[in-house]
Amino acid sequence: MIYLGIDLGGTKVSGALFLENNSLLLHETLLLEGREGKEVAGLVTELCKILLSKGEVPENECKCIGVCVPGIAYSKTRTCWCPNIPGWENYPLLDEIAESVPNSTVFVESDRTAYILGEVSLGVAKGCNNAIFIAVGTGIGAGILIDGRVLHGTSDIVGATGWMALKPPYDKEWDMCGCFESHASGTGIAMQAKKELKALLEAGKKGLSYLEKFEIEKITSREVFEAYDLHDSVAIKVIDTAIEMWGMAAANFVSLFNPEVVVFGGGLFGPASRFVDRIYEEASRWAQPISIKQCRFFPSMLPNEAGLYGAGAIAITNYKRDKNEQ
């Protein structure tokens, strides 16, 4: 049996051949370059064939392919929804790969499922049966592993963490992405900084924030972290609020699921990884006391590769599970 892991993102698709112990044999990356709909699926199957060719895998050999997508993989319909890929509202990716790659078994999962499986296979949560991966980037999502199994839910939407209710009363601005995401994702941090800066300037208080040097509508989380490092008052207020919310959200996970480990990753947890100790301190104020003492918080050990290794783990763990259940 040969295992393939495919990590599909919004701008590129990466893939690798894996051994059963999740050791990576070889990998390749192809750029989407504006492709949409069926063209993206074609690129995924092309990558599978490139990997199999480079690995000199015979066509008649059995293959298990794990794919992680930037959206929701619907297990009941075998389709996926990826908002950043035009034409992928209910796209039959699984069936297209299975038809294009002979003798293959294909499993498609959301990226947050891949992240937690990657960390449990090779990262800071290696060997854990109960672990949470909180992915903070443009949005916020979570992969949840309990008693050795990833949770999916009725509609495969488990882990839509951005909608956690953390700050009453309700505000209409949270309609599109939720309360938590509006404050503590990359997009949310930029949005809150813009709001604070506008309020400062409208009050006639100019020259008080480093962020004034930027065009307000072009401010991103990168500029906010840059300002934070310069002890900017606007950035400090926004980042401190995000830290509080990361801690509260983690506390909710700890109290609900009693995990061994909570892992923070995603694009934002390069600059934010230094705050993990503060996040744990905040979580300790809110979480069930016994559970939080048994739990450790870590930044991801696979910041740029969790999806790829997780995709390999999707193939390996699902194949082993199905084999054991036969």
Named regions from a protein language model:
Residues F18, T29-L30, I85-P86, D156-I157:
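Residue-level structural signal for beta-strand termini and adjacent loop
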Residues R78-E89:
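A charged helix-plus-loop insertion that forms the helical arch/lid used to bind
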Residues V106-S110:
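General beta-strand structural signal in soluble alpha/beta enzymes
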Residues P70:
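Conserved NAD(P)H cofactor-binding loop of Rossmann-fold oxidoreductase domains
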Residues K126-A184:
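Glycine-rich phosphate-binding loop of actin/hexokinase-like ATP-binding domains
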Residues T113-Y115:
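Short acidic loop-to-helix transition motifs that present clustered carboxylates
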